Amino acid sequence: KVTANYNNGDLDRTTHDSILSVGSIESEGTTYIEGKNYTSEAGRVTGKNTIIDVKENITIGSLTLKGDDKFGSDNDNNETYQLTRKAGSEVSGTDSVILNAGNNINVKGSMVGSDGTVQLTAENINILNEKESERKELKNKSGNILSNSSLEEKSYRESAVGSTIIGSNVILDAKNDINIKASNVIAIKGDGENPGGNIIATAGNNINILAETLDNSYSRKEKSSGFSTNFASGGGGFTAGVSYSTNSLEQTRNGTTVAISTLMSEGSTLL
């Protein structure tokens, strides 16, 4: 990950993360990884048969990329834009993907997939989402001796980046718990005598299929004030007057959305 910075003062600055290169392990045969732990952030592992076998934890996660922009003329007239994005990892095998961990398998905002069987075996299996966010803020103020106006607008929005486990057969085998949150487990039938399309999930304790709550908010404040002149005639006379008025408008909305989990098979689903 590299970060590009431009800073010409608080009202003229930008910072953005980007991925310069992605770590990759690839083979046309079997890709076999063995060790104490396996951790990936925006990495890629592929092969015909991909096997990761560790004593403790497998973590297939994402890399956080941030952006922050602010520009304007002064503290009353400017715009701010901030965002957070997630770049996930990938573990794939054309014929199969086998993940074995002595403790936990954690897949977060990433993909594990094969045209054949995908099998995860561990104490706990966690297939989870990541969150992305976007924040905007606008300030505008103008006026003169006779009138003034101001505007302040803010918004915030979250979105889910779910994990996906996909294969012709998907097997999840946990001694304790299986947790699936705002993510997808998909089994698609292939060709041949045993096309698959089955999901088999077994746990010693609980299988939890959960949703993720996402926050969003919006606020807008407008104010204006100023002098105005009024003219009237009647009864053979003519009158003129000056009045002063103020107006304000304030809107606020806060809400939540829900990102759900999906288990979809073209064959059988056994929990």
What are these regions (language model features)?
Residues 1-270:
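Binding/recognition "hotspot" determinant
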